[in-house]
């Protein structure tokens, strides 16, 4: 099979006095335009070239487009390049990418509701609260050992504190503020606790005296009836 390319060592003149035709054919042609233009009937592989030949302007335009593409370099797909003047192919790619990013952002906003809550419950799950142990709750509540912290629990007094308070109540049923502060410091109690204890103790004492008086009056009346 004969090669279409021409060798540089091929003789310029042919035997038999024929004129050289290599001067009309360039050895290094781009796009192979000149051989087809000057010799449309040249043989290729033992068969003649068809009468239909591409014009030279077609190859020149192709070479020009290729040279511009190589000189321009790779397309820049950055966001700022969207507003620049570029090759039509690069501009089209940047427009498509920009529209794709906007569609993704719009899709994300659609996934989240108007209240800002995501449609996926796994993302909105909160961390479990810390466990509450019995020793962390308030004691001495009215609803049992561990109850609500809204109401104040009943104060419990030790045996020593109760004995000292009873002694003081036996001598003085009403305390001055100075004496109340002294007893509170001595028994490691607050002034309010001392005040409440004496109030409750006086109410109890009044009830006891009332019962005693009622029993005495009822006993005297019975004795009077018997004597009559």
Swiss-Prot record:
One matching Pfam family: Homeodomain
GO-annotated cellular components: nucleus
GO function terms (MF aspect): DNA-binding transcription factor activity, RNA polymerase II-specific; RNA polymerase II cis-regulatory region sequence-specific DNA binding
Signal peptide as annotated in the record: none
PROSITE patterns: ANTENNAPEDIA, HOMEOBOX_1, HOMEOBOX_2
Domain of life: Eukaryota
UniProt KW Nucleus keyword: yes
Cell location: Nucleus
One annotated GO biological process: anterior/posterior pattern specification
Keyword match Transcription: yes
SMART domains documented for this protein: HOX (SM00389)
DNA-binding residue intervals: 150-209
Keywords assigned: Developmental protein, DNA-binding, Homeobox, Nucleus, Transcription, Transcription regulation
Main location: nucleus
Motif (Antp-type hexapeptide): 132-137
PANTHER family, A to Z: HOMEOBOX PROTEIN HOX, HOMEOBOX PROTEIN HOX-B6
Function: Sequence-specific transcription factor which is part of a developmental regulatory system that provides cells with specific positional identities on the anterior-posterior axis.
Protein family per UniProt: Belongs to the Antp homeobox family.
Name of protein: Homeobox protein Hox-B6a
Natural source organism: Danio rerio (Zebrafish)
């Amino acid at each position: 099979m004969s090669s279409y390319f021409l060798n540089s060592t091929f003789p310029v003149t042919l035997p038999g006095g024929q004129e050289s035709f290599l001067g009309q054919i360039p050895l290094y042609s781009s796009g192979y335009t000149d051989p087809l233009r000057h010799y449309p009937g040249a043989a290729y592989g033992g068969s003649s070239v068809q009468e239909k030949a591409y014009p030279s302007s077609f190859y020149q335009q192709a070479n020009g487009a290729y040279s511009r593409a190589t000189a321009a370099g790779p397309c820049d797909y950055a966001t700022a390049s969207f507003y620049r003047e570029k090759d039509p192919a690069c501009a089209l790619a940047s427009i498509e990418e920009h529209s794709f990013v906007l569609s993704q952002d719009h899709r994300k906003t659609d996934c989240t509701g108007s209240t800002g809550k995501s449609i996926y419950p796994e993302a909105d799950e909160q961390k479990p609260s810390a466990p509450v142990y019995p020793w962390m709750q308030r004691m001495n509540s009215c609803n049992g050992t561990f109850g609500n912290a809204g109401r104040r629990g009943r104060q419990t007094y030790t045996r020593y504190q109760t004995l000292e308070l009873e002694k003081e109540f036996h001598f003085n049923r009403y305390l001055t503020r100075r004496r109340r502060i002294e007893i509170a410091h001595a028994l490691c109690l607050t002034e309010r606790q001392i005040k409440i204890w004496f109030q409750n103790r006086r109410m109890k004492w009044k009830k006891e005296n009332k019962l005693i008086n009622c029993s005495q009056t009822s006993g005297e009346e019975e004795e009077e009836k018997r004597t009559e």
